[in-house]
Amino acid sequence: MADHVGNFRRRTAFSPCSQGGAGQDLAPLGLRVYRTERYSSPMPTDIVLVHSSDLHVDEDRAAAHGGDGTAALRSVLATARAVRADILLLAGDTFENNQLGGAILDRAGRRLTDASFPVVILPGNHDPVLAQSVFVRGGFGKLPNVSILGVTHNEAVPFPAFDLEIWGHAHRDYFNMAPLRGPRQRSTRWQVAMAHGHYEPPETRANPLRPSWVFGDEEIAATAADYLALGHWDRPMRVGNGAVPAYYSGSPDLAETVNLVRLTAAGDVVVTREPLSAES
């Protein structure tokens, strides 16, 4: 597949989909390796990304885990810390809604501040970027290690030290939108895309009763990204036709894992699932 940069080919070895074309569950701790041939010279080190979504931080009274509405966030942060992640990606619905009170937002902010790594957040359909969204009221955009698409950055977050760009379209209201519209021109060695919405396989794409926030194989392929971090589904799943490594992480509560994505010095993209670490 031709990249925006030029001489790029990705070789993938996908096993056949087992979900009627809708994708395939990631095997527990399974390994997927995607090889790029974009550069002849290796990077000095690997880049380690942790991808999660649909944490649904909520008021304590509505929460499991002993009544801690930030428990899923705490577990994901602990896991990212344990695997020494360079960057944590939260692909939508980090918060249950935009009506959460100050106490739970303050606690979530403290947990994010205590992280020893950058966090990139994509607002989803539960927590869209509104004038009084949780991101604005909670002051999350002021946290030095937190980048929020649609708040601190309009569309893309650069990481020059890694020659990496992470881009995505935030939900800005409660209406329908195209999560993968307008793919960005590649300007860095590594490019990761984020989207929060519903993957629809080719055989059902024409269904007029399909959900909102839809994208399919063509939109995925058009990103030409090295990895597409997806949110909105509670189950971890690989989707698409293989042109781009596109994965739902699933929610921490149901999946009990995060996706571990390693952008290797040799140019490979290695995707596995990592069990949630003991909360700390």
Regions flagged by a language model, labelled:
Residues 33-107, 180, 186-187:
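N-terminal active-site segment of His-dependent metallophosphoesterases
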Residues 254-280:
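Acidic, His/Gly-rich catalytic cores of divalent-metal-dependent hydrolytic chemistry
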Residues 26-31:
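Leucine-biased recognition of intrinsically disordered, low-complexity hydrophobic segments
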